[in-house]
Regions:
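Alpha-helix-loop-beta-strand connector modules within alpha/beta enzyme cores
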Residues: 3, 49-76, 122-129, 180-189, ...
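Active-site mouth loops of central-metabolism enzymes
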Residues: 6-26, 75-84, 108-113, 170-171, ...
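Histidine-centered catalytic micro-motifs
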Residues: 20, 25-26, 38-48, 71
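Conserved, mostly hydrophobic/aromatic
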Residues: 24, 31, 42, 99, ...
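Active-site beta->alpha loop and helix N-cap motifs at the rims of alpha/beta catalytic domains
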Residues: 25-26, 50-115
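Glycine-rich, proline-tolerant flexible connector loops at the mouths of alpha/beta enzymes
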Residues: 37-60, 108, 165-166, 223-228
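Catalytic alpha/beta core domains of metabolic enzymes, predominantly
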Residues: 98-220, 237
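Mid-to-C-terminal alpha-helical segments outside catalytic/metal-binding sites
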Residues: 240-268
Length: 268
């Protein structure tokens, strides 16, 4: 059971109508001060749409890397019409140290998040070949089996990190029973964390921390809510509340240095 918990920040909502690199970078750096050790970013254009053009992504992470030791995690996912090669574009960006890897198809609301096995394998190989550490995003129990089967072909860095994603309409519900079921399928020598999409409270996150999650993702990509009735306009308020929750369970908020050691990520 982990006595230190990594806070992973996902600061930009999928429906954000405007993405300004300097503003996002400032928001990220404020969250570093509050306890974030990883930032999870999709490649978006100034109107917030997913794109293979990495210019604005690179403009966002440059000041973050210059002013902090925060781990940069690029997303290779998101519901879009991009090819898997286009989705893998940020893997070539300087400074990318982790990548979220989606390991199966799933219904997300009214959309199908399409991740067939050949695409998963393609993305996995590019991640491993570049020395990037994958975070395996698992929306359904079967996805855990998918990635374990892929180990026969691809030599993933150990320990593997599984992120249990709950709460999307059409996928696994955000319940304690679902969390326990998903956790039970993850190998005991692997690391795991949680993302609660559409979160209105911190109850499920608190349960995951108590169960030994080594990572919790928080931020506007998943929810603006700080409690059941209030939203916030700054990610840092969510990070601060999560840090307080972690400490309330007599655990420590992991530093970027600790997260790098745990995940086998070299210092820049």
């Amino acid at each position: 059971m982990s006595d230190r918990v990594i806070i992973s920040l996902a600061p930009v909502a999928a429906d954000c109508p405007r993405v300004e690199p300097n503003e996002v970078a400032d928001e990220i750096l404020a969250c570093v001060e509050a306890g974030a050790a990883i930032v999870h970013l999709h490649v978006r254009d100034p109107q917030g749409k997913l794109t293979p053009d990495t210019r604005y992504f690179e403009q966002t992470i440059a000041p973050v890397m210059a002013q902090s030791d925060l781990i940069i995690q690029a997303s290779t996912g998101g519901v879009s019409q991009m090819t898997i090669a286009e989705r893998c574009a940020p893997l070539a960006c300087r400074g990318v140290e982790m990548a979220s890897l989606n390991v199966g198809s799933v219904n997300l609301g009214d959309n199908v998040y399409f991740n067939p096995t050949p695409d998963v394998e393609y993305c996995s190989r590019h991640i491993v070949e570049r020395g990037i550490i994958p975070e395996f995003e698992v929306f359904e129990i079967g996805m855990i089996n998918n990635i374990l089967a892929l180990q026969d072909k691809i030599n993933f860095t150990q320990p593997m990190l599984f992120n249990i994603v709950l709460g999307h309409r059409g996928s696994t519900p955000p319940t304690i029973d679902a969390l326990i079921a998903m956790r039970s399928m993850i190998p005991r020598d692997a690391l795991w964390g949680i993302t609660h999409f559409g979160r209105r409270d911190f109850g499920l996150i608190a349960a995951a921390v108590g169960m030994g999650a080594c990572e919790v993702r928080i931020g506007f990509e998943d929810s603006y809510y700080i409690n059941a009735s209030e939203t916030v306009t700054r990610n840092v308020l969510l990070v601060e509340k999560l840090a307080t929750l972690i400490r309330s369970q007599d655990k420590e908020v992991a530093t970027p240095e600790y997260a790098r050691k745990l995940l086998n990520i070299r210092h820049r």
